[in-house]
């Protein structure tokens, strides 16, 4: 992977790091399913940052962060297909990795990539085992389907976070604009009150129409601000 592509990929990763904790349970359920379907004791959902692997959900391990330099998933995000390592001790890429030669003595690995909306491999849904093995075609398809589900969940969360930020900006704009609009309206309403105290015999219906229009405008401004404030934060 060239430097420009990797920088773009890492930029895509940054969009998903602040994951909504309300959906953490969804991710935990998916890693549990991956573990059961693939009959593997360890399963992870992780994002691949520039030099670290950030674990967002897990089963069978206590790790939260791992260096990318010795990570199986570093190789996985560089390809588009599912990656399978049947026996890590026989694969020169991983035979000397710390997790292979030391506890937990990983032997098997399989992963499906998590994709951003613009097509970058931002992370993986992966499973590990301490004994060499392979997966059936059905297991591989299920792993890919679960990874797609993770991608959809994370993209939904990113979109909702973006919408909340836009709503905050919109509320602030509405607050400022309502002040700017209501100030002259309030002045006009004040003048109207003074005019009502003065006998006005020529075309009084014009005064009533103007008074009604100003009050309607004031009410409309209040409604707009109230509607904007109802948007989710």
Where on the chain are the PLM-derived regions?
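A short, aliphatic-rich beta-strand micro-motif
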Residues: 107-118
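Intrinsically disordered, low-complexity terminal regulatory regions
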Residues: 1-65
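Conserved DHp (HisKA) dimerization/phosphotransfer helix of two-component histidine kinases, i.e.
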Residues: 208-233
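Interdomain signal-transducing alpha-helical coiled-coil linkers
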Residues: 3-6, 136-143, 152-169
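Regulatory loop-to-helix N-cap segments in sensory/regulatory domains
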Residues: 65, 128-145
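Residue-level recognition of the "H+4" position in the DHp/HisKA helix
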Residues: 176, 180-183
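Regulatory sensory and allosteric helical modules in signal-transduction proteins
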Residues: 53-56, 63-107
